[in-house]
Swiss-Prot record:
GO MF annotation list: lytic endotransglycosylase activity; N-acetylmuramoyl-L-alanine amidase activity
One Pfam family named in its UniProt record: CHAP
Peptidase C51 domain: residues covered: 158-279
Domain LysM intervals: 51-94
A biological process term (GO) from this entry: defense response to bacterium
Protein name, UniProt field: Probable autolysin LDP
Gene3D superfamilies tied to this protein: endopeptidase domain like (from Nostoc punctiforme), LysM domain
Length: 279
Protein backbone atom coordinates (compact mmCIF):
# COMPACT_ATOMS: atom_id res chain seq x y z
CA UNK A 1 0.00 0.00 0.00
CA UNK A 2 2.85 2.34 0.80
CA UNK A 3 4.42 1.81 -2.61
CA UNK A 4 1.09 2.41 -4.36
CA UNK A 5 0.64 5.68 -2.50
CA UNK A 6 4.13 6.83 -3.44
CA UNK A 7 3.52 6.14 -7.08
CA UNK A 8 0.31 7.99 -6.90
CA UNK A 9 1.90 11.08 -5.36
CA UNK A 10 4.70 11.03 -7.94
CA UNK A 11 2.18 10.73 -10.67
CA UNK A 12 0.33 13.70 -9.33
CA UNK A 13 3.50 15.79 -9.16
CA UNK A 14 4.48 14.82 -12.67
CA UNK A 15 1.05 15.71 -13.90
CA UNK A 16 1.21 19.13 -12.30
CA UNK A 17 4.63 19.78 -13.79
CA UNK A 18 3.46 18.90 -17.26
CA UNK A 19 0.38 21.05 -16.80
CA UNK A 20 2.45 24.08 -15.78
CA UNK A 21 4.80 23.60 -18.72
CA UNK A 22 1.90 23.46 -21.13
CA UNK A 23 0.38 26.53 -19.53
CA UNK A 24 3.70 28.39 -19.88
CA UNK A 25 3.91 27.51 -23.55
CA UNK A 26 0.40 28.81 -24.17
CA UNK A 27 1.28 32.18 -22.56
CA UNK A 28 4.90 32.49 -23.77
CA UNK A 29 4.48 36.09 -24.91
CA UNK A 30 3.59 37.15 -21.38
CA UNK A 31 6.73 35.58 -20.00
CA UNK A 32 9.01 37.27 -22.54
CA UNK A 33 7.34 40.68 -22.28
CA UNK A 34 9.34 41.90 -19.23
CA UNK A 35 12.64 41.02 -20.96
CA UNK A 36 11.67 42.95 -24.08
CA UNK A 37 10.51 45.94 -21.98
CA UNK A 38 13.81 46.18 -20.18
CA UNK A 39 15.73 46.08 -23.44
CA UNK A 40 13.69 48.93 -24.97
CA UNK A 41 14.12 51.08 -21.85
CA UNK A 42 17.90 50.68 -21.98
CA UNK A 43 17.97 51.74 -25.63
CA UNK A 44 15.85 54.81 -24.89
CA UNK A 45 18.10 55.77 -21.99
CA UNK A 46 21.15 55.54 -24.22
CA UNK A 47 19.63 57.71 -26.98
CA UNK A 48 18.67 60.48 -24.47
CA UNK A 49 22.24 61.16 -23.26
CA UNK A 50 23.06 64.93 -23.11
CA UNK A 51 24.98 66.44 -26.02
CA UNK A 52 26.12 69.63 -24.21
CA UNK A 53 27.10 70.64 -20.70
CA UNK A 54 26.90 74.08 -19.08
CA UNK A 55 29.88 74.92 -16.89
CA UNK A 56 29.22 75.70 -13.22
CA UNK A 57 31.53 77.02 -10.53
CA UNK A 58 34.28 74.54 -9.64
CA UNK A 59 34.23 72.69 -12.97
CA UNK A 60 37.29 71.81 -15.04
CA UNK A 61 37.67 70.13 -18.41
CA UNK A 62 39.14 67.05 -16.76
CA UNK A 63 36.20 66.78 -14.34
CA UNK A 64 33.65 67.18 -17.15
CA UNK A 65 35.37 64.54 -19.29
CA UNK A 66 35.53 62.12 -16.35
CA UNK A 67 31.86 62.53 -15.45
CA UNK A 68 30.74 61.90 -19.04
CA UNK A 69 33.08 58.96 -19.71
CA UNK A 70 35.21 60.90 -22.19
CA UNK A 71 38.90 61.61 -22.54
CA UNK A 72 40.41 65.07 -22.56
CA UNK A 73 41.45 64.62 -26.18
CA UNK A 74 37.85 63.82 -27.14
CA UNK A 75 36.61 66.88 -25.27
CA UNK A 76 39.17 69.11 -27.03
CA UNK A 77 38.23 67.66 -30.43
CA UNK A 78 34.51 68.26 -29.79
CA UNK A 79 35.21 71.88 -28.78
CA UNK A 80 37.75 73.48 -31.17
CA UNK A 81 39.38 76.54 -29.62
CA UNK A 82 38.52 75.69 -26.03
CA UNK A 83 41.22 76.36 -23.41
CA UNK A 84 41.75 74.92 -19.92
CA UNK A 85 40.44 78.24 -18.55
CA UNK A 86 36.64 77.94 -18.56
CA UNK A 87 34.00 80.08 -16.86
CA UNK A 88 30.55 79.39 -15.39
CA UNK A 89 27.98 79.63 -18.17
CA UNK A 90 30.26 78.29 -20.92
CA UNK A 91 28.63 75.54 -23.01
CA UNK A 92 30.82 72.45 -23.63
CA UNK A 93 29.86 69.98 -26.36
CA UNK A 94 29.94 66.30 -25.39
CA UNK A 95 29.58 65.04 -28.98
CA UNK A 96 31.21 66.07 -32.27
CA UNK A 97 29.72 69.34 -33.53
CA UNK A 98 30.20 71.81 -36.37
CA UNK A 99 33.55 73.57 -35.81
CA UNK A 100 32.29 77.01 -36.72
CA UNK A 101 29.39 76.86 -34.28
CA UNK A 102 31.53 75.57 -31.44
CA UNK A 103 34.18 78.23 -32.01
CA UNK A 104 31.60 80.99 -31.70
CA UNK A 105 30.01 79.41 -28.63
CA UNK A 106 33.30 79.16 -26.78
CA UNK A 107 34.88 82.46 -27.82
CA UNK A 108 31.89 84.73 -27.49
CA UNK A 109 32.32 85.23 -23.71
CA UNK A 110 35.95 86.19 -24.29
CA UNK A 111 34.96 88.83 -26.86
CA UNK A 112 32.38 90.27 -24.51
CA UNK A 113 35.00 90.56 -21.83
CA UNK A 114 37.36 92.45 -24.17
CA UNK A 115 34.56 94.78 -25.18
CA UNK A 116 33.81 95.46 -21.54
CA UNK A 117 37.42 96.45 -21.00
CA UNK A 118 37.21 98.98 -23.83
CA UNK A 119 34.10 100.50 -22.33
CA UNK A 120 35.82 100.85 -18.97
CA UNK A 121 38.88 102.54 -20.45
CA UNK A 122 36.98 105.21 -22.34
CA UNK A 123 35.64 107.11 -19.28
CA UNK A 124 39.18 107.26 -17.87
CA UNK A 125 40.48 108.95 -21.02
CA UNK A 126 37.61 111.41 -21.06
CA UNK A 127 38.17 112.28 -17.42
CA UNK A 128 41.83 113.07 -18.07
CA UNK A 129 40.85 115.42 -20.90
CA UNK A 130 38.48 117.30 -18.63
CA UNK A 131 41.22 117.95 -16.11
CA UNK A 132 43.39 119.52 -18.82
CA UNK A 133 40.57 121.83 -19.94
CA UNK A 134 40.10 123.17 -16.39
CA UNK A 135 43.59 124.72 -16.45
CA UNK A 136 42.50 127.47 -18.88
CA UNK A 137 40.31 129.45 -16.38
CA UNK A 138 43.26 129.66 -13.94
CA UNK A 139 45.35 131.49 -16.54
CA UNK A 140 42.47 133.82 -17.34
CA UNK A 141 42.14 134.80 -13.66
CA UNK A 142 45.84 135.60 -13.46
CA UNK A 143 45.62 137.92 -16.45
CA UNK A 144 42.59 139.69 -15.00
CA UNK A 145 44.42 140.44 -11.76
CA UNK A 146 47.35 141.94 -13.65
CA UNK A 147 45.08 144.20 -15.69
CA UNK A 148 43.07 145.31 -12.65
CA UNK A 149 46.26 146.38 -10.88
CA UNK A 150 47.19 149.01 -13.50
CA UNK A 151 44.41 151.58 -12.80
CA UNK A 152 45.75 152.01 -9.25
CA UNK A 153 48.92 153.50 -10.72
CA UNK A 154 46.97 155.93 -12.91
CA UNK A 155 45.09 157.41 -9.94
CA UNK A 156 48.23 159.12 -8.60
CA UNK A 157 47.97 162.89 -8.96
CA UNK A 158 50.86 165.31 -9.25
CA UNK A 159 50.36 168.58 -7.37
CA UNK A 160 50.57 171.60 -9.59
CA UNK A 161 51.68 175.11 -8.77
CA UNK A 162 49.36 178.02 -9.54
CA UNK A 163 50.62 180.12 -12.44
CA UNK A 164 49.76 183.77 -12.63
CA UNK A 165 48.89 185.28 -16.00
CA UNK A 166 48.78 188.96 -16.82
CA UNK A 167 46.06 190.05 -19.25
CA UNK A 168 44.78 193.44 -20.31
CA UNK A 169 41.78 193.43 -18.04
CA UNK A 170 39.70 196.13 -16.42
CA UNK A 171 38.72 195.12 -12.89
CA UNK A 172 35.98 197.11 -11.21
CA UNK A 173 36.67 195.66 -7.78
CA UNK A 174 34.55 197.30 -5.11
CA UNK A 175 34.78 194.42 -2.69
CA UNK A 176 32.65 191.29 -2.58
CA UNK A 177 29.19 192.47 -3.56
CA UNK A 178 27.81 189.02 -4.39
CA UNK A 179 25.10 187.35 -2.30
CA UNK A 180 26.51 185.72 0.81
CA UNK A 181 26.69 181.90 0.75
CA UNK A 182 26.38 181.62 -3.03
CA UNK A 183 28.94 180.15 -5.44
CA UNK A 184 29.76 183.63 -6.82
CA UNK A 185 30.53 184.91 -3.34
CA UNK A 186 33.04 182.10 -2.73
CA UNK A 187 34.66 182.38 -6.21
CA UNK A 188 35.27 186.12 -5.69
CA UNK A 189 36.99 185.52 -2.30
CA UNK A 190 39.03 182.52 -3.52
CA UNK A 191 40.41 184.46 -6.49
CA UNK A 192 41.33 187.30 -4.17
CA UNK A 193 43.25 184.83 -1.97
CA UNK A 194 45.20 183.69 -5.05
CA UNK A 195 46.00 187.31 -5.99
CA UNK A 196 43.86 187.19 -9.11
CA UNK A 197 40.94 189.48 -8.38
CA UNK A 198 37.84 189.70 -10.54
CA UNK A 199 35.00 192.18 -10.99
CA UNK A 200 32.42 192.77 -8.30
CA UNK A 201 29.49 193.30 -10.68
CA UNK A 202 29.43 190.31 -13.03
CA UNK A 203 25.94 189.29 -11.93
CA UNK A 204 24.74 185.70 -11.72
CA UNK A 205 27.10 182.81 -12.53
CA UNK A 206 25.48 182.18 -15.90
CA UNK A 207 26.61 185.70 -16.97
CA UNK A 208 30.24 185.43 -15.86
CA UNK A 209 31.46 184.05 -19.19
CA UNK A 210 30.25 187.15 -21.05
CA UNK A 211 31.20 189.64 -18.33
CA UNK A 212 34.76 188.26 -18.07
CA UNK A 213 35.32 188.62 -21.80
CA UNK A 214 34.07 192.22 -21.70
CA UNK A 215 36.42 192.92 -18.81
CA UNK A 216 39.35 191.57 -20.84
CA UNK A 217 39.81 188.19 -19.14
CA UNK A 218 40.84 185.23 -21.26
CA UNK A 219 38.03 182.68 -21.53
CA UNK A 220 38.46 179.25 -23.18
CA UNK A 221 37.93 175.51 -22.69
CA UNK A 222 41.35 174.76 -21.19
CA UNK A 223 41.46 174.30 -17.40
CA UNK A 224 44.38 175.52 -15.30
CA UNK A 225 45.07 175.92 -11.60
CA UNK A 226 43.42 179.10 -10.26
CA UNK A 227 41.06 179.51 -13.20
CA UNK A 228 37.33 179.90 -12.60
CA UNK A 229 35.24 177.09 -14.09
CA UNK A 230 31.85 178.33 -15.26
CA UNK A 231 28.64 176.81 -16.60
CA UNK A 232 25.30 178.34 -17.55
CA UNK A 233 23.41 175.20 -16.53
CA UNK A 234 20.53 175.67 -14.12
CA UNK A 235 18.48 178.78 -13.40
CA UNK A 236 21.50 180.90 -12.33
CA UNK A 237 24.52 178.90 -13.55
CA UNK A 238 27.45 177.85 -11.36
CA UNK A 239 31.10 178.83 -10.78
CA UNK A 240 34.05 177.54 -8.77
CA UNK A 241 37.85 177.53 -8.76
CA UNK A 242 40.20 174.90 -10.24
CA UNK A 243 42.56 173.60 -7.55
CA UNK A 244 44.47 170.97 -9.60
CA UNK A 245 44.67 169.48 -13.06
CA UNK A 246 45.23 165.72 -12.80
CA UNK A 247 47.35 163.56 -15.17
CA UNK A 248 44.36 161.41 -16.09
CA UNK A 249 42.51 164.45 -17.54
CA UNK A 250 40.25 165.13 -14.57
CA UNK A 251 40.28 168.31 -12.46
CA UNK A 252 39.78 168.94 -8.76
CA UNK A 253 37.76 172.05 -7.86
CA UNK A 254 36.61 173.95 -4.78
CA UNK A 255 33.18 175.57 -4.68
CA UNK A 256 30.28 176.71 -2.53
CA UNK A 257 26.56 176.05 -2.59
CA UNK A 258 27.05 172.75 -4.52
CA UNK A 259 26.69 170.53 -1.44
CA UNK A 260 24.30 172.96 0.27
CA UNK A 261 23.81 176.66 0.99
CA UNK A 262 26.97 178.34 2.33
CA UNK A 263 28.78 174.96 2.35
CA UNK A 264 32.29 174.89 0.94
CA UNK A 265 33.21 171.58 -0.73
CA UNK A 266 35.59 170.05 -3.25
CA UNK A 267 35.16 167.35 -5.90
CA UNK A 268 36.77 165.82 -8.98
CA UNK A 269 35.21 166.61 -12.35
CA UNK A 270 35.59 163.75 -14.82
CA UNK A 271 34.50 165.70 -17.92
CA UNK A 272 36.14 169.13 -17.66
CA UNK A 273 35.60 169.84 -21.36
CA UNK A 274 31.97 170.88 -20.83
CA UNK A 275 32.92 173.96 -18.75
CA UNK A 276 34.27 177.42 -19.61
CA UNK A 277 37.42 178.62 -17.86
CA UNK A 278 38.09 182.24 -16.89
CA UNK A 279 41.83 182.81 -16.53
Amino acid sequence: MKKSLTVTVSSVLAFLALNNAAHAQQHGTQVKTPVQHNYVSNVQAQTQSPTTYTVVAGDSLYKIALEHHLTLNQLYSYNPGVTPLIFPGDVISLVPQNKVKQTKAVKSPVRKASQAKKVVKQPVQQASKKVVVKQAPKQAVTKTVNVAYKPAQVQKSVPTVPVAHNYNKSVANRGNLYAYGNCTYYAFDRRAQLGRSIGSLWGNANNWNYAAKVAGFKVDKTPEVGAIFQTAAGPYGHVGVVESVNPNGTITVSEMNYAGFNVKSSRTILNPGKYNYIH
